[in-house]
């Protein structure tokens, strides 16, 4: 699957011709379909990692950098995926920031240490390209494997969440490839009885995917993820 089909923009340049700072990796995701509170929380997480300098050999921990998503830090309650269901919880929406950072880090050549997929595939990223976090136990960790520091720029620009990783390391071009092994379409399920319908679940396809990072020298499998199908459920009841 090409980059255009991933919904994540990225820049990963060829070998640098100058020793000055340059973009090593860049990714962006769209906030248009997110709730106001999800946008707010994603922006707060961006502010927490913006300006972070990752030293050579250092492991960047998203949870340690962002910290808890508590009310006293300004986070709001918003929909979050929990055990296969959507519930309102403090910090809902932060996973969009971790997902965007993950994609930028892949293009920057950072080494994957820890990453978790969501139970269901989120709308803002393609299958295999998401990175779920839940403070403090479910983390995203990436190691700076280069000999130079990497600086994080994380911004919300209109409806776009954009993360850029900047450094002096020379690196070859990197391609991220996602291979869909299996895909399941959601079914329409009617539940209850009556004359008044309401949409209980919008439904999402299910996927099994493998994701690879490709350089001129190698092709490395990053992950194999399974996302179950979420059926479209219409609940019927008697109108009041």
Provide a role label for each language-model segment.
Residues 1-7:
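N-terminal Sec-pathway targeting helices
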Residues 7-240:
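Well-ordered beta-sheet/strand-loop patches within structured domains
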């Amino acid at each position: 699957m090409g980059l255009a089909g991933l919904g994540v923009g990225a820049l990963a340049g060829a070998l640098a011709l100058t020793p000055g700072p340059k973009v090593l990796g860049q990714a962006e995701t769209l906030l248009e379909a997110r709730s106001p509170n999800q946008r707010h929380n994603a922006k707060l997480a961006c502010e927490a990692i913006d300006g972070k300098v990752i030293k050579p050999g250092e492991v960047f921990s998203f949870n340690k950098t962002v910290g808890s998503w508590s009310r006293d830090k300004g986070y709001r309650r918003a929909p979050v995926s929990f055990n296969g269901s959507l519930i309102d919880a403090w910090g809902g929406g932060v996973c969009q920031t971790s997902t965007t950072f993950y994609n930028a880090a892949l293009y920057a050549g950072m080494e994957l240490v820890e990453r978790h997929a969501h139970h269901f595939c989120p709308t803002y990223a393609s299958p295999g390209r998401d990175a779920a976090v839940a403070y403090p136990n479910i983390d995203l960790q990436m190691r700076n494997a280069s000999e130079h520091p990497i600086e994080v720029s994380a911004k919300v620009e209109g409806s776009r969440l954009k993360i850029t990783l900047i450094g002096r390391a020379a690196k070859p071009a990197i391609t991220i490839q996602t291979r869909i092994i299996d895909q399941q379409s959601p079914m329409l399920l009617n539940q209850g009885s009556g004359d008044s319908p309401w949409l209980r679940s919008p439904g999402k396809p299910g996927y099994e995917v493998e994701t690879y990072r490709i350089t001129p020298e190698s092709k490395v499998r990053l992950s194999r993820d399974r996302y179950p199908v979420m059926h479209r459920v219409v609940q019927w009841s008697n109108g009041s």
